[in-house]
Amino acid sequence: RAGDDSRYGFIAIADPQIWAPKEFAKLAAAADDIAATVRSYGGMPFHGICCGDIVSHDHSLYGRYNEVMERTGITFRNAMGNHDMKVYGRSYETSFSKFEQMYGPVYYSFDVGRIHYVVLDDNFFIGRDYFYIGYLEERQMRWLEKDLARVQPGSTVVVCLHIPSTCEEQDRKQFRYDRAGSTMTNHRGLYEILKPYRAHIISGHTHTTFNQPIAP
């Protein structure tokens, strides 16, 4: 119905990880596929998000990525991935400067229809070149508590971030999960904040697809 934002489609992608200009042909094909999917719904509004690793450390490719994603015909928001960090600075606080220059804050929220969306940054650069852990800083935890204070308990909340908060055991075996950079080390704090809501967490990082129930 015209003006009705309670019915819409949502598309999540992750880890396009563009490392060279020649990779954009593959991204264009994926963008065209998204556009075809959107058209197949006969005018239903859509929005999307990329859950990080937009590029593979060459942040000069952000502009071209944005141009190619316009082919989808829908608004795409972005979460930051570990490859989107500047992982050669002196501190965590300097690691997200390139991302913020292009896309704005690394954590934010928005509403579409009756759904509240939250985007977080759980890539924590530890000050040694290319080393990071999955960790949600206290500043974001406190911000999230304030943000959700205006959301009715029992409402649906969708959290988008890059490094998964948890994984199934069978999926752990495919990756280096002995490394603290593979999952969010302090995920219990996030789960506690989300407990009053019908929460769904969407992430990337592992280059595979799985669904992991968290709450009983």
Model-derived regions, located:
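Active-site glycine-centered loops adjacent to acidic/histidine catalytic or metal-binding residues
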Residues: D15, G52-D53, G81-N82, H162, ...
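Residue-level marker for buried hydrophobic side chains located in beta-strands
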Residues: F10-A12, C50, N78-A79, V159, ...
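N-terminal active-site segment of His-dependent metallophosphoesterases
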Residues: R1-G63
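Extended active-site neighborhood of metal-dependent phosphoesterases/phosphodiesterases
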Residues: H59-T156, R176-H200, T208-P216
